[in-house]
């Protein structure tokens, strides 16, 4: 029988190995492949069944090694959707509505345009009340909706907070809630077996 601590260490070691492998694969993506894959991903996102009704698109601004989200952000803005991107606030992420000058935002330590600290965030309760399509980053994804992030748990906590806000809103109301659809957003090569 495996001791619980030993099992957790095995899972942690497996996740660490998968993260290392995924980061190496991302670093090997050529600029040409990134551009083609980014345009393809934006086309797939805008063809997703949740896209037409989405009032809000939660996107992320890409690290240089990640799939480029600029094409999907521009498509959402062109479609008249609100777009919000994450900002790290303490140990959590908060989503900030994208400003027209977002490309001029100063870059953070990950070389990502950083939303200004003074920009107001959209509370999870407000997000829960909007038809939302969330494009979630990760290092690896499986076909059942699982994802392996970078290990800080930012998105896990955020998605849990929106789920809690949606549950609370549903308990107060008998009407249907606005849909919230989260999809892993990355390269097809980031899809792994469960």
In which residue ranges do the predicted regions lie?
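Surface-exposed, charge/polar-rich loops and edge strands
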Residues: 1-13, 17, 24-28, 79, ...
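N-terminal active-site beta-alpha-beta segment that forms phosphate/nucleotide-binding
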Residues: 2-130
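Short, charged low-complexity linear motifs
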Residues: 40, 137-140
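Short linear sequence motifs
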Residues: 44, 147-148
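Short glycine-rich anion-binding loops that position phosphate/pyrophosphate groups of nucleotides
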Residues: 63-65, 139-143
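Non-catalytic alpha-helical scaffold/packing segments enriched in small hydrophobic residues
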Residues: 71, 154-157
């Amino acid at each position: 029988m495996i001791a619980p601590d030993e099992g957790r260490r095995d899972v942690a070691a497996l996740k660490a190995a998968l993260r290392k492998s995924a980061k190496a694969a991302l670093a090997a993506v050529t600029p040409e492949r990134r551009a083609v894959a980014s345009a393809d991903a934006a086309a797939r996102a805008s063809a997703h069944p949740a896209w037409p009704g989405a009032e809000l698109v939660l996107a992320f601004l890409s690290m240089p090694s990640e799939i480029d989200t600029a094409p999907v952000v521009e498509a959402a803005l062109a479609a008249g959707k609100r777009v919000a991107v994450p900002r790290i606030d303490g140990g959590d992420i908060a989503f900030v509505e994208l400003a027209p000058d977002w490309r001029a935002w100063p870059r953070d330590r990950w070389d990502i345009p950083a939303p200004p600290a003074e920009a107001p965030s959209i509370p999870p309760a407000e997000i829960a009340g909007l038809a939302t399509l969330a494009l979630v980053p990760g290092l690896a994804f499986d076909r059942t909706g699982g994802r392996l992030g970078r290990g800080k748990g930012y998105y896990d906590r955020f998605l849990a907070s929106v789920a809690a806000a949606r549950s609370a809103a549903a308990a107060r109301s008998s009407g249907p809630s606005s849909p919230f659809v989260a999809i892993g957003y990355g390269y097809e090569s980031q899809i792994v077996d469960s």
